[in-house]
């Protein structure tokens, strides 16, 4: 077995890169699913694109539950392995996967049930509602597959097998890219399914990803084995899984909540603003992914070094991550300022929407650079096991500051107020994040 002391011995930058790159790639692939779907769905009609934008937050929520709970399972497995407690790691894996499947079943039923009334709250256009129901009905029935796939991803990550997760994700993503145009437009022998085809293509991609994981689990020996004997519910273990998982789920689910509230504010003015917000969120995932990948790489490193009492290294790691995410955000800002309209036109062919969207992007990107502070501080706190402090930062960013700001500015300036609320929120949150992080890390707690 490889010893984990490399976390405090290897030079900072190569170490951070080796941990972060696989994470960045896997997250990019995950968001590619959504981008590819949008690209082809935009070719159907503007209504189809609006339907996709309205369903997106709910889809995002399902992913948040899967990934957030996976983070909990991952942490408990990694800690068990680190302490040499194989049985605990095996139990965490088995019960984590069983609970994930259960989450999938509950979410499938709940989301399909709420969808008609959910869509009706945001639009009165029956074509949009019809398409939204078609898409979500198929997309949500793959929830169990998504949950299981993400549990296996976190299982392989916890034992350091990043290459397997890459292969599985790529297989699913490539299948989705190939199947999307075939099932949406139906060339040759393929059925023309329209927006349902997009949902089906994504589902088939997810099935393929899970299949690769199951095959890899059979073929490659990994230190964690799933055994039936480990399925006996273990109360304290399950509580531990949720203690790490629930704050992580909330961190990931808050943006969904925000998008839905903002959709409500914007739909008063026109449907095209809802589409612009949907497009912005798709572009934004691309920008924030490399940054949050670096931060994901930081998590285990900062926790390990903090535990080992290496406070100097904790500070170096934090600063290196802050610089790296700052550089990424600066590049993102430049791209948005230079190519706002071309980026928008990838997802809509309405000239008015492209113009308004370009203007929106240029306003919003003012907050990118400073947001590196909150992204880094939040990740560092999670790595130190301070989930609740990290949640405070996310709450500022996605609810406490931005909702009142968007509401007031929208009253004062119309839809542009919503775009200004974004950068104002980033500035305020960065200040709060820095303060929370300094207060938490200044006094190393005696263990």
Regions found by a protein language model. Name each.
Residues 49-109, 113, 146-160, 164-165, ...:
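Small-residue-rich hydrophobic transmembrane alpha-helices
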